[in-house]
Amino acid sequence: MKFRHFIYATLLLASCATTKDATDAAQGVIKDTHNSSVNAAQENKNRMTIKRYNTPNGFAFSLLEYITGKETQENICISPASAECALAMVANGARERTLEQILSTLNSKSLDSLNNKEIYKQPIKESGTKLTLANSIWVNKKQPVKEQFIADNKKYHNAYVSNVPFNDNTASTINEWCSQNTNGKINNIVDKLDDKTKMLLINALYLKGAWMDEFNKNATTDEPFTKADGTTTTVKMMHQTLTTSYNLDNNLRMISMPIAESYIWVWFILPRKGMSMSEAAAHLATNFNKLCKGAYHSQRVKLSLPRFSIEYKTSLKESLMALGMTDAFDKNANFGGISDKPLYIDDVMQNTYLKIDEKGAEAAAITHVSVGYLAMRPTKEPIEVKFDRPFLYVITDVMTNSILFTGQVGNPTE
């Protein structure tokens, strides 16, 4: 089985100067906006809160808890790793309390530790697995930017930097860059650019891999899936019995599907009946590492998992503010390391695409590789785990202890 996961993340900054309204925030650009945007951010600061977990990957689960708690869509896909990378780039230009809040939100002790995280430095390009991160900074040639900001992002994040006129031709160039760095899956993220736009920062994350244990497509059957509202829908349910990592507690059951030729594991998590996805995310925030360690003693599992795909687009602005990163989004922002002109973040956007099926587009001979500390002690009788109601997933890089992607599946047929 192969899965593909593509993500496009943008960071949007704005000048505090009063000019005309900004264009579509989904473009993720630095531009001039109304002061009304600043005032709205200031208002939101006082009414949005969420628990921040000082645990490994606490940032990821805080995002997941917040988004699953407020999102009306049944299927969610976010990338904490991509968000962190985009914020790490802009953090190189943040100063004083603005920088402190960014670091605190990301659970980073210092800017140096944030810039030097291993996940940024270990792209995987094996025969069956590919994980790449790409960063770019597009600067309006009329916008002055400090050389040290550019130098730091080239050094730590290998950012491609281009000083160009912001017009339709540049928009096409940016779209082509995104297409090239997402294997053609995300092609059109900028409709138009003009001189009100000052800078566009983009992080693209592309992941493709084959399961160690494929599903037999002939075993896939039409079966009912009960949605959160109690109604049912018919899904393509994949089946196999395998030896893999499994664990449970009083609140959830979780099973891992390792990706061949890598240290990437995909965890599928089934909360107990009656538990919301937001409650399950909060439980994972403080128990995920413990549950993972307990799961390293493998079990025979009879697994039933629906085939699904997700296309998702969201703003992370509200979530980040709720985590305490407030100054960056209003007139208190200090991005003096980017420019002497006052700037603040207008938005942080993500576009994601995830597809999981039995084989994938490039299914071939798969090399089975075990993680070194996985103790194989299977039980005699397989444990049955059936994902026939809403569940969570977490895609991890166990080598760097990073959460690449996470989200929920509430309707596999969407």
What positions do the PLM features span?
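Extracytoplasmic/secreted cell-surface and envelope-processing proteins
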Residues: 98-100, 276-278, 312-314, 364, ...
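Short Gly/aromatic-enriched secondary-structure transition segments
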Residues: 102-106, 215-222, 279-286
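C-terminal soluble interaction/assembly domains
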Residues: 347-414
